[in-house]
Regions:
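Juxtamembrane helix-loop-helix connectors linking adjacent transmembrane helices
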Residues: 2-5, 36-49, 72-143, 150-156, ...
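Alpha-helical transmembrane segments in multi-pass membrane proteins
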Residues: 16-70, 80, 88-93, 126-129, ...
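Hydrophobic cores of alpha-helical transmembrane segments in multi-pass inner/ER membrane proteins
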Residues: 55-64, 132-139, 196-197, 254-267
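Membrane-interface helix caps and helix-loop-helix hairpins in membrane proteins
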Residues: 113-120, 176-184
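Membrane-interface helix/loop boundary segments of multi-pass membrane proteins
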Residues: 140-165, 201-209
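Central hydrophobic cores of alpha-helical transmembrane segments
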Residues: 162-170, 211-223
Length: 281
């Protein structure tokens, strides 16, 4: 008996999301469980399970688009276009994200809140590693949150409601961890919501393309990776850590929130709605 998956479109978005997640788990668990049981290296275990999860996520998206929405080019619908223009948007986003991080740390250095240090490792390797990590994180999270999830939300809700739900779920997803770790990192929640808003506005600014959000997300991760892994800074202690960032995480400090707020305000003012109208949505 052939199952008519197009009937899922008649159900509200929470039901569709649950069905998709259950299908993904059904595909992932048979491969993930043996890895958890047999692989002793925790780093290798995490890498293998995450790679398998994301490969199956992309595989399932293709089926979801064809069988549920009758859209054979679902990735283009999400804004993942392999075009020159989208590539330029990725580079623009990388530049904006990297510049934002460098300006934040540069300003704190000028104010005497941190001290710049000589790198403890070969900086060229860190820069290349950071670029790869940043692009990987940006691609994965933006296809998930500003591609699939945002599309599902916008099918049922008005644009501004979908915007806020997407941003909040994006922030909440970073707290799927033990309670102690949640409490430890909770101060970064406002900055993550602002980043989620920024990414949706960035996609709308570029008329639904994912290039800018992928690049911007990647650039932020890239910049922080270079400074953090390269051990380029040391806080002077002239101001409390809630100003510069609790646990040395700029997203957990007032300065990080202010910078993310400024970035959100700027990109939100630039974004273009699907109707070509300027302004925040």
């Amino acid at each position: 008996m052939k199952i008519n998956l197009t009937q899922l479109t008649q159900y509200p978005v929470p039901v569709r999301l649950v069905c998709f997640i259950l299908a993904l788990l059904f595909l992932w668990l048979p491969l993930a469980v043996p890895i958890y049981l047999l692989v002793k290296d925790t780093n290798l275990e995490s890498i293998l399970t995450l790679v398998i999860l994301y490969v199956e996520f992309i595989f399932l998206l293709n089926i979801w688009g064809k069988q549920v929405y009758q859209q054979p080019k679902i990735f283009s619908h999400y804004g993942l276009e392999f075009t020159r223009l989208n590539g330029v948007n990725v580079l623009q986003g990388l530049a904006i994200g990297l510049t934002t991080v460098l300006v934040l740390f540069g300003l704190e250095g000028v104010l005497g809140w941190l001290i710049w240090q000589q790198p403890q490792v070969f900086l060229g390797r860190i820069i290349l590693e950071g670029l790869l990590v940043g692009f990987g994180v940006g691609f994965a999270e933006e296809l998930l949150f500003r591609g699939w999830l945002l599309d599902e939300l916008q099918r049922d809700y008005k644009l501004n409601i979908a915007l806020w739900i997407d941003a909040i779920l994006f922030a909440v997803s970073h707290f799927i961890k033990p309670l102690e770790a949640i409490i430890h990192t909770l101060p970064q929640f406002p900055a993550l919501v602002l980043l989620g808003l920024t990414q949706v506005w960035g996609k709308r600014w570029r008329r639904g393309r994912l290039g800018l959000p992928i690049g911007l997300h990647g650039g932020l991760v890239w910049g922080y990776y270079i400074i953090n892994v390269g051990q380029l800074t040391k806080y002077s202690g002239q101001v409390p850590d809630w100003v510069t960032g609790v646990n040395n995480n700029p997203l957990q400090g007032v300065m990080g929130v202010l910078f993310m707020g400024g970035l959100a305000w700027w990109i939100g003012g630039q974004q273009v709605t699907g109707n070509g109208e300027q302004g925040r949505v």
